[in-house]
C-alpha cells in the first residue's frame, strides 16, 4: 500500500497533508480485533508520514487521540502525561498505534528537521457517523440507545462503564 500512497502524493504534490484516516471503533470492536486496530493504524500513519517525507511535503498534521494518555490521567489532560501510566485496556492497541504516529512525527522532526505535528481532537460525532451497536463510539451508541428506547417506551438505558470518565465532544 505504501507504493500507492507514495505515488498519489508524488502525482498530486500537496503542500500540506492532514491525516484524519484511521480504523476506529467502540469498546466491543477494539476488544475483539486489537491486531486489526494496531496493524491498520500503524500502516496508515507509516505510509503517510514516510511518503510525505520522501515527496518533500512541507507540512504534515497528524490527528492523534485522547486515548493515548494513561487511564488514570488527571483532568484536564496535559501533554506531559503521555507514557506515564497504563493505557485503557479496552482500546490499548488503537492507543499504541496512535502513539507510534505521534512519535514518528517527533522523530522525523528531530532526525530530518521537519515540522510535522500531532494534534489531539476531542470525540467527534455527527452526520454519517457509525451507529452500529458493535462498532460505534460512545456518543453515537448513546444516541442510538436513546432513540431505540424511545421507540419501545423503555424507561432506562444501559450505559457501560463506571460513569466516571470525562469526555469532550464536538458535533461536526
List where the protein language model places each region:
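Active-site loop/turn elements of alpha/beta-hydrolase fold enzymes
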Residues: 22, 65, 121-124
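Conserved Rossmann-fold NAD(P)-dependent oxidoreductase catalytic core, especially the SDR/UDP-sugar
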Residues: 19, 46-91, 117
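NAD(P)H-binding glycine-rich loop region in Rossmannoid oxidoreductase-like domains
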Residues: 1-41
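NAD(P)-dependent short-chain dehydrogenase/reductase
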Residues: 72-81, 103-172
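Active-site helix of classical SDR
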Residues: 93, 97-100
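Conserved mid-core alpha-helix of short-chain dehydrogenase/reductase
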Residues: 4, 43, 47-51, 104, ...
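Catalytic Tyr-X3-Lys loop
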Residues: 14, 34-46, 50-53, 57, ...
Amino acid at each position: 500500500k505504501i507504493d500507492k500512497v507514495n505515488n498519489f502524493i508524488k502525482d498530486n504534490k500537496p503542500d500540506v497533508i492532514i491525516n484524519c484516516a484511521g480504523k476506529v471503533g467502540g469498546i466491543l470492536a477494539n476488544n475483539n480485533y486489537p491486531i486489526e486496530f494496531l496493524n491498520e493504524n500503524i500502516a496508515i500513519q507509516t505510509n503517510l508520514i514516510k511518503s510525505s517525507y520522501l515527496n518533500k511535503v512541507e507540512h504534515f498534521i497528524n490527528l492523534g487521540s485522547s486515548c493515548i494518555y494513561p487511564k488514570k490521567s488527571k483532568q484536564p489532560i496535559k501533554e506531559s502525561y503521555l507514557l506515564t501510566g497504563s493505557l485503557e485496556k479496552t482500546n490499548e492497541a488503537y492507543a499504541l498505534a496512535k502513539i507510534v504516529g505521534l512519535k514518528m512525527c517527533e522523530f522525523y522532526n528531530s532526525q530530518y528537521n521537519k515540522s510535522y505535528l500531532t494534534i489531539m481532537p476531542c470525540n467527534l460525532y455527527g452526520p454519517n457517523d457509525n451507529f452500529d451497536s458493535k462498532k460505534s463510539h460512545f456518543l453515537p451508541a448513546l444516541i442510538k440507545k436513546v432513540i431505540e428506547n424511545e421507540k419501545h417506551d423503555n424507561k432506562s438505558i444501559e450505559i457501560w462503564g463506571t460513569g466516571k470518565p470525562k469526555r469532550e465532544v464536538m458535533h461536526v
